[in-house]
Regions:
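N-terminal targeting signals for export/organelle localization
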Residues: 1-63, 245-251
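C-terminal cap of thioredoxin/glutaredoxin-like
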Residues: 5, 12-21, 25, 169-251
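Soluble non-cytosolic domains of exported or imported proteins
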Residues: 14-18, 22, 29, 93-96, ...
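Soluble periplasmic/extracytoplasmic beta-strand elements of cell-envelope proteins
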Residues: 25, 38, 83-86, 114-118, ...
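Short amphipathic alpha-helical surface patches that mediate protein-protein
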Residues: 29, 40-43, 153-157, 169, ...
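Short amphipathic alpha-helical/adjacent loop interface patches that line ligand
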Residues: 32, 99, 195
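A short beta-strand-turn-helix
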Residues: 65-82, 107
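Structural alpha/beta surface segment adjacent to cysteine/selenocysteine redox centers
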Residues: 85, 90-91, 96-169, 173-174, ...
Length: 251
């Protein structure tokens, strides 16, 4: 009886006063601009918050880059002047194209640029994006991220568990350790942290890049990255004080 009474009270509390509802609907009918203005105000507030979050990340890249880098794989200059952060998805065809361009770019600027890889698997459209990211992270724990990354992009049309194990064998990884780590909670935590950083930047697709404080996206051409590098090289980068980091060469 008590339960029935409580349910009745809840339902009663949830009921909308018909008179009040009619008045509200009449106001909306007579003044539709009120709804439009409210929506616009909400959108502006959302955009403001997103912009603030983005600027916070960009400022952090400038003042405390090692915090942004964290334990992400890096290649290139160990004492860099230019920081290039890549957000990528192993199942994204545009990322595979950008990967080839980045290899050419880094071959030219190994002593000047530090490339940082961040995972941003688009799981809503790419079913193998997350498993591939976990496999790459597990390979990183054995010092083979960049080689593993190359293999994933080179065989993007074959993504799946069979390929992940085959690449691990080819790179002479400890398979037991590899399989344990790619299925463990640590991989999820690291990738989720990268995703959160991407969301703060307002990233909606891949590939996405940040060079120092400048952002750009898509399957960029080599000439585009060179132009952005030239622009950033002219800036005063005295605040970009990175501690030396282990280097993994791009093959």
């Amino acid at each position: 009886v008590q339960a029935a009474t409580n349910t009745s009270q809840v339902n009663s509390n949830n009921l909308i006063n018909p008179k009040l509802e009619a008045e509200v609907l009449q106001i909306i009918h007579n003044h539709p601009e009120v709804v439009v203005e409210a929506l616009q105000a909400f959108q502006q507030q959302q955009q403001k918050q997103q912009q603030q979050a983005k600027q916070s990340v960009l400022q952090e890249i400038k003042t405390n880059p090692n915090k942004i880098i964290g334990e992400s794989p890096t290649t290139g200059a160990t004492e860099p002047k230019i920081l290039l952060i890549e957000f990528s998805d192993f199942q994204c065809p545009y990322c595979a194209k950008a990967h080839k361009t980045l290899k050419q770019f880094m071959a030219r600027h190994q002593d000047e640029v530090t490339l940082v890889y961040k995972h941003f698997p688009l799981i809503s459209i790419h079913s193998e994006a997350m498993p591939a990211a976990k496999a790459a992270w597990a390979a990183q724990q054995q010092g083979k991220f960049w080689e593993y990354q190359d293999a994933l992009f080179a065989q993007q049309n074959k993504l799946g568990d069979k390929l992940y194990v085959a690449i691990a064998k080819k790179l002479n990884l400890d398979l037991e350790q590899f399989n344990q780590q790619r299925s463990g909670n640590a991989a999820d935590a690291v990738i989720q942290k990268d995703i959160e950083t991407a969301m703060r930047l307002g990233i909606q697709g891949t590939p996405f890049f940040v060079m120092n404080e400048e952002t750009f996206d898509g399957a960029v051409e080599l000439s585009d990255i060179e132009r952005i590098l030239a622009k950033n090289s002219k800036k005063n980068l005295s605040n970009l004080d990175l501690a030396p980091r282990p280097e993994y060469a791009l093959n």
